Amino acid sequence: MADDMVYQEAVAAEVIQVNGRTGVTGEIFQVRCKILGGKDTGRILTRNVKGPVKLGDLIMLRETEREAKQLGKRRK
């Protein structure tokens, strides 16, 4: 069964802007990142990232086609 596993290539992206936090407890960061390799090199995406992240961090993306929805305004 282990021989049937298919590995997918990951593409590096640099965090260029941290837009905000989302999730029930704020554990998800919404970031804008610039793709550094692959067919979408230079494209800027909005993605949700779990865990601590800061400007200039490199993240590895399994796919570059999907983009996160913009965060809505917070209600009080």
Curated annotation (Swiss-Prot):
Gene3D superfamilies documented for this protein: Nucleic acid-binding proteins
Molecular function in Gene Ontology: structural constituent of ribosome
InterPro entries, A to Z: NA-bd_OB-fold, Ribosomal_eS28, Ribosomal_eS28_CS
Matches recorded under CDD domains: S1_S28E
Keywords: Ribonucleoprotein, Ribosomal protein
Record-stated family: Belongs to the eukaryotic ribosomal protein eS28 family.
Origin superkingdom: Archaea
Gene Ontology biological-process annotations: maturation of SSU-rRNA; ribosomal small subunit assembly; translation
Chain's gene name: rps28e
Protein name: Small ribosomal subunit protein eS28
PROSITE patterns for the chain: RIBOSOMAL_S28E
Keyword Nuclease recorded: no
Signal peptide range in chain numbering: none
GO cellular component, one term: cytosolic small ribosomal subunit
Protein's UniProt keywords contain Ribonucleoprotein: yes
